[in-house]
């Protein structure tokens, strides 16, 4: 598809285990986003660690993860891209990242699967976000 609207990914959650079904293939970043919107604040000038695990049904290149302020996409901890291999668990670890602009009242975790193949299924689990131990 071009930049026309397609069906949103099917998203289910079960006790910290998330499953994303992507029935339609996409070709560019930001075309297959899932947002986990929280009430978790982010402190200014404070490093945080993030980790999670993925398991994809098919190979998918350029999966994007971004943790950002719910009120400003310009105030974020990081934007990282990862390539997932079919059937292989992949662990993401992002240590000691700091908000770019300053404190955030609430954070959202964005997963983007733009560039996904048709019929993709991705599981996301073991999500950890915490202040870096000093």
Task: Annotate each predicted stretch with a short phrase.
Residues 1-8:
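Short, tryptophan-glycine- and acidic/Ser/Thr-enriched carbohydrate-recognition patches
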Residues 91-131:
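Extracellular beta-strand ligand-recognition surfaces/modules
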Residues 18-20, 24, 33-63, 90-97, ...:
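Extra-cytoplasmic beta-strand recognition segments
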Residues 14-16, 84-90, 103-105:
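Ser/Thr- and Asn-enriched, surface-exposed coil loops between beta-strands
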Residues 8-29:
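Short carbohydrate-recognition loop motifs
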Residues 75-85:
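Solvent-exposed serine/threonine-rich low-complexity stretches and specific carbohydrate-binding patches
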Residues 30-34, 58-70, 105-107:
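Beta-strand acidic-aromatic groove motif in beta-rich domains, primarily in extracellular
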């Amino acid at each position: 598809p071009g930049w026309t609207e397609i069906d949103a990914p099917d998203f289910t959650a079960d006790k910290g285990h998330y499953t994303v079904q992507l029935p339609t293939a996409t070709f560019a970043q930001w075309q297959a986003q899932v947002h986990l919107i929280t009430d978790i604040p982010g402190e200014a000038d404070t490093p945080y660690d993030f980790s999670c695990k993925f398991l994809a049904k098919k190979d998918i290149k350029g999966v994007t993860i971004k943790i950002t302020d719910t009120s400003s996409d310009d105030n974020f901890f990081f934007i990282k891209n990862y390539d997932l291999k079919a059937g292989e668990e992949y662990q993401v670890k992002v240590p000691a990242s700091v908000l770019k602009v300053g404190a955030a009242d609430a954070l959202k975790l964005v997963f983007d699967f733009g560039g996904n193949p048709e019929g993709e299924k991705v599981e996301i689990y073991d999500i950890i976000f915490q202040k870096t131990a000093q």
